[in-house]
Amino acid sequence: MPESTQQSHLSLDHEKMQQPPKGFTERSKTKPNLADFETYQKLYKQSIENPNEFFTQQAKENLDWFKPFDLARFPVDPKDDYKNGDLPAWFINGQLNACYNAVDRWAIKNPDKPAIIYEGDEPDQGRIITYGELLKQVSKLAQALTKLGVKKGDSVAVYLPMIPEAIVTLLAIVRIGAMHSVVFAGFSSASLRDRILDADSRIVITADESKRGGKTIETKKIVDDALKECPKVRNVIVFKRTGNSHVPFSPGRDLWWHDEMAKYGPYFPPVPVNSEDPLFLLYTSGSTGKPKGVQHNTAGYLLGAVLTTKYTFDVHEDDILFTAGDIGWITGHTYCVYGPLLAGATSVVFEGTPAYPNYSRYWEIVDKYKVNQFYVAPTALRLLKRAGTKYVEKYDLSSLRVLGSVGEPIAAEVWHWYNDNIGRGQAHIVDTYWQTESGSHLLTPLAGITPTKPGSASLPFFGVDPKILDPTTGEELPDNDVEGVLAIKSAWPSITRGIYNDYNRFIDTYLAPYANYYFSGDGAARDRDGFYWILGRVDDVVNVSGHRLSTAEIEAALIEHPIVGESAVVGYADELTGQAVAAYVSLKKDKAVGEDVENIKKEMILTVRKEIGPFAAPKMILLVDDLPKTRSGKIMRRILRKVLAGEEDQLGDISTLSNPGVVQQIIDVVHHAKK
């Protein structure tokens, strides 16, 4: 069982309850999707007590079906969800297509309406893609993929920057009933290789190069390096992002995007798929080190995406949603691609960073396109808060109605900065909690109706039945003013259908820790008003800039360095990124660093950058004589975390360690590193 959260965070609920901004309803051109808080309470109760009835109505209203479903979920009664490792099936016997729901129905209704607003890395680079044009582009690529032998159920690997062609790619893949497996374009060639092999992808779609923050990234070269060990990959489709003529190209295997698109006509019919057919794989970090291919299926995921987009953000067809998240992560999947397009809205796709060419970039985009909903990680907000309000003041942000936060809890002082300087007291902040595995929001305020507390994820979304469990006994803590681990009692439509090719691992990770519950991996509290607070991971995952990284994966990379004997990676608080990575490293017995210690540390960091990617690089390398272990050989990461947090007086009884004397040396090393 995970360790219990030691420090109580219930004092956080002293923050005054914030009511939704006055005039929220009047500032929308359209009537809100939910009338008031009482309506939420009524619908939420129905979604828990009678999920079949609730989700039947929602699925009929929000999705188009080629063949109507017979039953929203089976078994109808959620009391046996997760029993024996089983998950319910959703929308039994229904057939639909994700691309049709995201593109065709809106292209038919209004082909000239903008679907995607693209803002390039440079402020003068951008274009608008209408729903009609999007349908043509998606149809062309769908035909190209079909001609290359991609069929229903196959997986296609995607390694693209944040450009419109990335969205076209995802939609074309699901149009023909295949699965996309997007790999974040900041991952190393080794990480890309592992994901291509695990998903058994035979086609890769990429770009010649990428642009980010004024820098050029050799995207195609990374793909080529990965494919040296992926013999089953037949073809690579390459989009010309920069047009660099020196980019490596393998005739026969490699195909230029523009050549393939020119071969085909403007329409290709969507392939009907069953409700529970796979939609995509997205790899996330796991505590065992091997990345997990989280699988989402079609109908349940689509419904979760569209409902949360409409109700969390109050998105309407005439709205513009700017999600500042990459498609390499679940935030980009659900709230840059599927959510806004399923709702018939316009999605802003931003290639760059919040600091290039200066710290006003986000606000320039909001002003330029009159964005209505903005969704971002607290990491970016901390960076922009530190830069100062001078980068905000000259922009008109009055179009904003909703400000979202994602990836980690937002600190109260950042919440207030966001509210006062970006929302200017007129936009509603929704601090959302969810996971790659959940597909869509689990805990969140609903725009315009839910009171909020800075730092709290507020209340559950429809169909989500959260419980706080005692981490030791697994018993529910039913009252308010309690703290433990967060679990979900019954399944919701967009829950992952498992880990690709490894369902037992899914059971072991999420269902086995607490019988008859889905275990989130997070500590949580429910305050005296029933509001939920997320307290951080209780497993071996660190959260850096809103991205979950496996400590085991980083440790495995460090071991690749020739003098590293053992390593233990933990997260620690960082003002900018929320958490940063610290690596405790002990050297092989016959190795020493001498006076070259700083260069050796740099080499270790570079090893991680090469094996995983720059975002996973440790911020701190701590060379120690040994790691604290139990007599069975388990490394006590709890001790390492507490020493880093300055809580060496709270280590408890260390006499049971096999090597208790090493603890003082670790404390000394940490103190020296912090000087």
Swiss-Prot record:
Q: What is its EC number?
A: 6.2.1.1
Query: Where CoA is bound, by residue?
Result: R212, G213, G214, K215, T331, S545, R609
Specify the superkingdom: Eukaryota
| One example GO MF annotation | ATP binding
InterPro entries documented for this protein: Ac_CoA_lig (IPR011904), ACAS_N (IPR032387), AMP-bd_C (IPR025110), AMP-bd_C_sf (IPR045851), AMP-binding_CS (IPR020845), AMP-dep_synth/lig_dom (IPR000873), ANL_N_sf (IPR042099)
> Bias category Polar residues: which stretches?
1-10
What would be one Gene Ontology cellular-component term for the protein? cytosol
- Report residues binding ATP: G407, E408, P409, D431, T432, Y433, W434, Q435, T436, D522, R537, R548
Task: List GO BP terms, alphabetically.
Answer: acetyl-CoA biosynthetic process; acetyl-CoA biosynthetic process from acetate
Which reaction equations make up its catalytic activity? acetate + ATP + CoA = acetyl-CoA + AMP + diphosphate
This protein's UniProt keywords: ATP-binding, Ligase, Nucleotide-binding
Keyword set includes Nucleotide-binding: yes
Region (Disordered) residue spans: 1-32
Keyword Ligase carried by entry:
yes
The family database entries (NCBIfam families) matched by this protein are listed as: Ac_CoA_lig_AcsA, PRK00174.1
- Protein family according to the UniProt entry: Belongs to the ATP-dependent AMP-binding enzyme family.
Q: Which PANTHER family match?
A: ACETYL-COENZYME A SYNTHETASE, ACETYL-COENZYME A SYNTHETASE 1
What is the name of the protein in this document? Acetyl-coenzyme A synthetase 1
